[in-house]
């Protein structure tokens, strides 16, 4: 990888010279050599009482100078654990690891006859996802408070909805939860009932859907999809409850994806940029169209996640990449 930091050559406590950075690269592991080559290099090196090199490349270059060592392009996410502080950085890196679905095609043959349940399917992302799945010949069942009185914050209502679908279709392949509540206001202006309702829908609703979905998706080796927000990485003023529940959803998805992978259940989380939905318009008013993602594009990414092999991933959806 290109050297981005300032590299200095010192003489004691003073800079002797600064090498030309354009000629420097950062080496990464792994380093690979023919067994015969590396064995011969170390055979010579171990006879040298002044042996000081710290990596295999250095051993080969110093002790077998006629052997060319080819360099390939590295990857920024290939981080080396050297110092104690690196463990913290690597932990954060894996927490924020994301995936994108740009190259996954949507074929009717993959979705025809599949049974999908969408919670929060009455408008916005849920409505567009339902419509697109139906266009691909999937059987779609939508539930929401406004459509048929189903509140994901109430476990028994989620259970009844899934049971009704299963009794009718005898299988459930996909379960998608787009239900969410956003109230844009300072925390100290919020009453406890409003806070409770938001947590009940956004977070407890996620848990309820997951727990009630488990048996059906275990049988079908199905897919479970939830939604987060770009605010999950850093809390935002005036919607602390919303952003904190979205952070909780990411952590929850990553955890149950590991638990349920042995049973063939894939669990992912869609992370769209600011999206034009009725909920956003209600809270933020009219915004420039070119600054918002369309609900249709988020729906496409949602369906792509259903036909992907991903699990435990936070899937970014961006305006310029969909």
Show which residues each predicted segment covers:
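C-terminal helical subdomain
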Residues: 269, 285-322
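N-terminal Rossmann NAD(P)H-binding glycine-rich loop of SDR-like oxidoreductase domains
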Residues: 122, 130
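Conserved NAD(P)H cofactor-binding loop of Rossmann-fold oxidoreductase domains
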Residues: 178-184
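Substrate-binding pocket helix/loop in short-chain dehydrogenase/reductase
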Residues: 186-187, 191-196
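Active-site helix of classical SDR
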Residues: 210, 245
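Alpha-helical segment proximal to the catalytic Tyr-Lys
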Residues: 215, 258-259
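Conserved core of the sugar-phosphate nucleotidyltransferase
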Residues: 1-72
């Amino acid at each position: 990888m290109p050297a981005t930091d300032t590299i200095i050559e010192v003489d004691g406590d003073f800079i002797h010279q600064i090498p030309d950075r354009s000629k420097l690269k950062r080496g990464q592991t792994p380093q690979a050599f023919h067994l015969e080559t590396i064995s011969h290099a170390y055979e010579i090196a171990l006879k040298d009482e002044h042996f000081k090199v710290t990596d295999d490349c250095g051993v080969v270059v110093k002790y077998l100078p006629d052997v060319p060592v080819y360099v390939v392009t590295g990857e920024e996410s290939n981080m080396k654990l050297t110092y104690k502080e690196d463990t913290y950085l690597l932990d954060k890196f894996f927490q924020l690891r994301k995936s994108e679905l740009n190259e996954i095609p949507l074929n009717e043959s993959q979705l025809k006859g599949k049974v999908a349940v969408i919670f929060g399917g009455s408008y916005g992302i849920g409505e567009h996802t339902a419509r697109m799945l139906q266009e691909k010949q999937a059987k779609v069942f939508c539930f929401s408070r406004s459509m048929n009185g189903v509140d994901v914050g109430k476990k028994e209502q989620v259970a009844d909805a899934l049971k009704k679908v299963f009794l009718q279709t005898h299988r459930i392949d996909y379960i998608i939860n787009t239900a969410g509540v956003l109230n844009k206001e300072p925390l100290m202006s919020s009453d406890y009932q409003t806070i409770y309702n938001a947590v009940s829908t956004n977070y407890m609703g996620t848990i309820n859907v997951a727990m009630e979905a488990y048996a059906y998706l275990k049988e079908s080796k199905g897919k479970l999809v939830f939604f987060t927000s770009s605010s999950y990485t850093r809390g935002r003023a005036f919607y602390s409850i919303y952003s904190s529940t979205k952070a909780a959803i990411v952590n929850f998805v990553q955890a149950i994806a590991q638990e349920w992978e042995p049973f063939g259940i894939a669990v992912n989380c869609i992370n769209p940029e600011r999206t034009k939905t009725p909920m956003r318009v209600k809270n933020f008013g009219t915004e420039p169209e070119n600054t918002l993602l369309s609900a249709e594009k988020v729906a496409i990414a949602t369906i792509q996640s259903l036909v992907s092999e991903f699990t435990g991933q936070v899937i970014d959806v961006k305006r310029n990449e969909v």
